[in-house]
Amino acid sequence: MCIRDRYILQYYSRISKNRLHIAKFITTFVVGGLIVVIPLLVNLIATMMFVPALKPIENGLFMGNGSSFMNVLFVKHTFIYTFIYIVQFFIYGGAFCVIALASSYIFNNSFLVMLMPFVTFYGLGVVSNMLRNMFGMDSFNPMRLLASNMLSDKQLAAYILEPIIITVISGIIFFVKGADNEAL
C-alpha cells in the first residue's frame, strides 16, 4: 500500500541513513527498558497501596554491615535504593533489547533473533561461573548482578560496565551491518 501510494518515497528522501539508524537504536533501547520497567512500577505501586511503608529492620539479609552493595542505603533511604534499581533494570532491559536488534542484521531467522537476548543472558551467566570456578574471577553473571541482596562491592565495576559493553557491542554490530542493509 505504501509503495503504491508513493508515501514511502517521501520517508526515504526526508531522512538520512545515519539519523534513521540512530532513531531505530534509541527507540529499541527505550522500548526494551520500558518493557522491563512498567511491570516493576505497577508492582511497586500495588505493593505501596496494600503494604504499609515501614522502614526495613536490620536483620538477616538487610544488615548494614557492608556485605551487600547499597544495603545501608536500603535501610536508610529505601525509595532512593528502589529508584536506583529500577534505573538499572531499565538499562539492562534496553541493552538486551538492542541485542535482538543487532542480531536481526546477522540472522534471517526471526525465532533465533527473539532468542538471542535470552541466550546472551544465560550465556554470560555460564561463562561468568566458569571463569569464577577456574580462575577465581569476580562474577559478572547478570542474574547475580540484578539480585539486590547478592551484589557485593567488588562487583560494582561489572554492575556498571556490563550493560554499557553489551550496548556498545550491539550498537557496533547494528551500525556496521545495518548500514549496508537499508534502502536509503
Place the predicted regions along the sequence by residue:
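Junction motif at the cytosolic side of a transmembrane helix
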Residues: A102, I164-L184
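A residue-level signal for alpha-helical anchor/packing sites in multi-pass solute transporters
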Residues: R6-I8, A102
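Secretory targeting signals
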Residues: I22-Y105, P142-E162
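Transmembrane helix-loop junctions in multipass membrane proteins, especially transporters and channels
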Residues: L44-P56, N109, N129, N133-M137, ...
